[in-house]
Structure formats: structure tokens, C-alpha cells
């Protein structure tokens, strides 16, 4: 093998023969130009409206009847920015008929990062199907690291520590951390506004973003617009391990969903309610969604 970068490329080709989601390797060593290369950032990015170029969440009022929220990433490091933006514009969202949430190209992150959106979507109890975690010392290290991550609040960190201890007590087994296959979330209030919520999706959505969509799809207010998502959720909760040479990292899923085999998402994806076909220029996607929500 000429070098570690080519080794990583060949390993990914071999891995992709078996499955696409939540397993692979990234080359993280130096290239000739001194840049780091990963499989993720080599993937093509759809050219679209300027909001898609934003690396941070942004909010706009498009017109009297419609507000727009762009969320490019659900990484836990983005939670504070997402929550702050939503809080600053909460009154506007709650007084506007239509709400567009644009998650195109959002690859996932942490479920906690979309929690502040749920009160706007909620219309009835939300069912979230759980998962089993495979317990080993290496796998469990991720849960311990989450319990020490400053981006999570103290309650979450305490919960992660409890999960870690439960996993350590059951090594070599698949562990149900939540002691139930389905969690049901009930809220006291159904907000009258926004009345209609359009979530814009595409083929680059996976992982936590697809979990957000499974939650949102249970709302009577929500329609999904765009293209079928990537399909990368059944095997999830990624752990990352660096090779001894330090040039390659392996990422792989730690959990398997109770949804499978009855409702698989991996390599299938989630379909939109309203398909945006290729005759509609990517520059006009948001105009299309806006007009559809406004009944035009």
C-alpha cells in the first residue's frame, strides 16, 4: 500500500460493499497540502440558496405569513446556538402561520440539539422507539466521554454516567438503557401557531436528522418537502477510534433500533410528503415550499 490515505480509501470501498451507514474510516493525517481529508467532507454538497452555505443556524421572516429557520448541523456543539436563535425568535414563530425548517445537508449529531423545536411541532403524544447498545469496554468509553462533555447540561451528564455504569455491569450483552422499547412524550400545550410546518429535506440527511424527522412526522402540522433521505439510522450512536499510527479513524455504530426489521430506515431513507422533482431548480426550492404552504 503506497500510503495511509490510499489505505483509508480502499478500506471504505470494501466497507461500502457491506453497508453504507454509520461505519467507515476517515483519513485524518496530513495531505501534501497540509489539509485533513475525511470521507464526509469529500461528499458533494448540493448548490442551492445562500442559506445552505451557512455553517451556523439562521432565522428569517420571509413574508407576513412565513418564517424560515436553517439548521445545517445537529452536533451537540451547535445546541446553544440553535436554542438561542429559537428563543430570540420564539414570539415571531408563535405568531406566524407558516414555519419552514430547512435541514438539507444536515448529517446528524445529537438528539438534544433539536429538543427546542418540539414544542412548535407538537400536536399529540410522540412515540420514540428505543434501541439496544452493545456493551464492551471500548464501546462504553463513548458514554463516559459524553458524561464529561461540557456541551451537555448537568442532568444529561449525570444520565450518561448512569448509562455507562449500567453498560459496564453487562459487558458482552445488548443492553436496553431505557428499560422500555418505546418512550412516549406528552406535552401540556398545543400551540395554535404555526399552523403549517414544512421541513425541507434531501439525500444528505441521516442519523439524528432522520430521528428528528421520525419525531416531526407524528405531528398533524408537519409535511416533509424535498427528496428521500440517506437512510442511516437503524444502527446508530457512533463511536470513533483512532488507529495506532494516528492517521486513520474508524467510526461505527454502537446500537440497533427496536424498529428493525419491521420499519427499516438504513439504505432506504425517509420519503417526503411532497417530492421536489428535478424540473424545479434548487434555487427555487424554498419558493416552492413557501408557495405550497400558502396554498398557491
Regions found by a protein language model. Give the residues of each.
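Flexible, low-complexity junctional segments that flank or bridge functional domains
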Residues: 1-155, 193-196, 223, 228, ...
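Extended, charge-rich low-complexity interaction segments
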Residues: 127, 132-134, 158-176, 255-271
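Flexible, glycine-rich surface segments
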Residues: 146-149, 158-229, 234-236
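Conserved active-site loop/cleft motifs that coordinate metal ions or position small ligands
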Residues: 251-253
Amino acid at each position: 500500500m503506497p500510503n495511509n490515505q490510499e489505505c483509508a480509501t480502499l478500506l471504505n470501498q470494501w466497507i461500502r460493499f457491506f453497508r453504507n451507514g454509520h461505519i467507515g474510516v476517515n483519513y485524518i493525517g496530513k495531505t501534501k497540502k497540509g489539509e485533513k481529508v475525511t470521507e464526509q467532507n469529500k461528499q458533494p454538497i448540493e448548490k442551492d440558496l445562500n442559506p445552505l452555505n451557512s455553517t451556523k443556524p439562521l432565522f428569517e421572516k420571509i413574508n407576513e405569513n412565513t418564517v424560515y429557520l436553517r439548521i445545517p448541523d445537529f452536533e451537540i456543539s451547535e445546541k446553544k446556538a440553535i436554542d438561542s436563535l429559537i428563543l430570540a425568535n420564539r414570539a415571531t414563530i408563535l405568531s406566524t402561520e407558516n414555519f419552514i425548517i430547512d435541514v438539507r445537508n444536515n448529517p446528524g449529531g445529537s438528539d438534544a440539539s433539536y429538543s427546542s423545536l418540539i414544542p412548535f411541532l407538537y400536536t399529540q403524544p410522540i412515540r420514540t422507539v428505543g434501541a439496544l447498545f452493545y456493551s464492551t469496554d471500548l464501546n462504553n468509553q463513548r458514554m463516559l466521554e459524553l458524561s464529561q462533555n461540557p456541551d451537555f447540561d448537568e442532568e444529561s451528564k449525570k444520565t450518561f454516567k448512569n448509562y455507562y455504569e449500567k453498560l459496564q455491569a453487562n459487558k458482552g450483552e445488548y443492553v436496553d438503557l431505557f428499560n422500555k422499547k418505546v418512550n412516549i412524550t406528552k406535552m401540556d400545550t398545543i400551540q395554535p401557531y404555526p399552523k403549517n410546518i414544512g421541513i425541507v429535506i434531501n439525500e444528505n440527511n441521516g442519523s439524528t436528522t432522520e430521528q428528528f424527522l421520525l419525531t416531526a412526522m407524528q405531528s398533524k402540522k408537519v409535511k416533509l418537502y424535498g427528496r428521500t433521505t440517506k437512510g442511516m439510522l437503524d444502527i446508530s450512536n457512533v463511536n470513533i477510534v483512532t488507529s495506532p499510527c494516528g492517521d486513520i479513524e474508524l467510526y461505527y455504530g454502537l446500537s440497533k433500533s427496536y424498529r428493525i426489521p419491521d420499519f427499516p430506515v438504513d439504505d432506504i431513507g425517509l420519503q417526503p410528503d411532497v417530492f421536489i422533482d428535478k424540473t424545479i431548480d434548487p434555487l427555487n426550492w424554498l419558493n416552492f415550499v413557501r408557495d405550497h404552504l400558502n396554498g398557491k
